[in-house]
Amino acid sequence: MENYELQIRKTRTVPGTRGNIFDRNGEVIAYNELAYSVTIEDIIPTDTKTEDKNKILNDTLDSVLSIVEENGDSVIDNFGIILDSSGSYQFAETNETSRLRFVADVHGKSFIDDLTEKEKNKTAEQIVHYLCKRYGLDYSEHDAAYILKMVNMRYAMGLNSYQQWLTTVLASDVSDATAAAIMENQDSLQGVDISEDSLRRYPDGQYFASIIGYTGQISQEEYDDLSDDEKKRYSLSDIVGKSGIEHTFDSVLQGEKGKTTFYVDNLGKVTDTVSMTDPKAGNDVYLTIDKNLQISAYKLLEEKLAGIVLSKLSNVLDYDPSAEKDTKYIKIPVGDAYNSFIANEIIDMKKFGRTDAKPAEQAVYNTFTQKKAEILSELMAQLQNENAPAYKDLSKEMKAYMDYICDTLLKQTTGILMSDKIEAEDETQIAWATQETISLNRYLNYAISKNWIDTSKLGDSAYSSSEEIYSGVLAYLEEYLKEDSNFDKLLYKYLIKSGSVTGAQICAIVYEQGVLPMDENAYNGLLNGTTDAYGWLYDKIKTLQITPGQLALKPCSGGIVVTDPNSGDVLACVSYPGYDNNRLANNMDSTYYNQLVTASSRPFYNNCLLYTSDAAD
């Protein structure tokens, strides 16, 4: 009787293996592969105090994180917040509706409209701090990267809290070494186990991503959109097609779930299996696409785009295309190409200032920090000056900074300057936006007088006068710009245009950061001036070691459709540039997803079908 009381009956569903996707000749395009995953099951008694439960879970997850990373693997990264290039928290989603859907999920709200204005306006950092408080994590004692990993795991567990005995994946596709280390330490890792999961794989993914899409865990919004009959077949832990063929044919590819009923003891160990129903595999899908033709067409299109870029590339740092009467004579200044390495994050500017930075990185960073201090000082001086020059009298560079502050930062990014409140026919608005006869200082002070400024986004301070509000705006701007990676990119753009940061330095960093395999002769030549940066870049584009999709210079995208004239079958449907859907499937790489969403070359946009292939948009 005593043993019986310590046993708990549990039922767990077992997903069916997803069907494969083949081309017209039976060549595999998407398949499944068994791999080890680190999982955790919440077996902490429900009557445990929240503080004690948080400590147990956090200690366990900290140990898991150490084991996983010591063996060269990584924990899940599918949370809606990532670290930007300056190491600050930012939302992975750039689409406002998707961002608010994530914020609503964090706050346990079924609908976006249920959020308060304060909740809607929370920054990514505030969301992280809110969750840290909920999870008992002290964010002041750890760096942002560690906190984000812990929040990733705790949040994933929280999504399964509606069913206590549901396991949560903490790390997928881990090595044998990680699996062995977890098993060796299992006695001290409460609820942690190694499972063998079926992971989705896409060989040659970049060529087919725009067609195939990818899989991932179903979202609350996707689940809510299902019919009542469909909800009987799906649960919130299911892996589903998120876009492309994977999404359209999800009901075909999905297998039928199996079910296992068993008893566990108070330590969560299985003591007896009561019943078991085997899962059934999903159906395979065959496409009219010819895999080899698809790959060949993709490569042909990439070569063609590279050829056009090279034909337009000019060995000048700055260039005004408006002077050309015929667009066919417009050139691509090499300065734009050098800038693309930073603007499109081919190289990582946050590494420039690290203690282990290489020579070219250090030199560029020193130039940048001096420039940033000068520009911030000049900007704040103009914003504080009632008699500052009118916008039209500023230099092209200073205009770019003012545009960024007003249009990008205050309007689009933060919403401090409320676009929906601005009166387009207002005389002062016209003077700023069209005639360019006033300064940003005068414009913002006028915006305050017209109640176009949302002071709730400046912090918790109360403002009793227009002067205090303007001071609050300036203080906010000064602090924000210090950590704003997009503003940093704009600074680098003008450093490169002026030659203060050289093309040779940028090209050398490509080797220093491992974007291309180290070539000592070329690298040293770039540093000492014996290798011409323009010639180096020309060669790398010509040989496609640096691609049009990476540089995102115009043209950088295109599409090819090949059909069989007899049957009408689509044999190839190429959209360039593609993306690696393996990094989005299973457990999404949120940082990579954000790079794709913000990339100037728009890899999610299907250039054949003319729509955005990502499910989030």
Listing of model-derived features with the role each one plays in the protein:
Residues Y611-A616:
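Conserved small/polar residues in nucleotide/adenosyl-binding loops
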Residues D318-K328, N594-N606:
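Surface-exposed intrinsically disordered loops and tails
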Residues M1-I541, Q545-G559, G578:
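Membrane-proximal periplasmic segments of bacterial cell-envelope enzymes
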Residues D278-G282, R602-L610:
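Flexible glycine/proline-enriched surface loops and loop-helix/loop-strand junctions
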Residues I560-P565:
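Short hydrophobic alpha-helical segments used for membrane anchoring or interfacial signaling
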Residues V38-D47, G578-A599:
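A short, polar/charged loop-to-alpha-helix boundary motif
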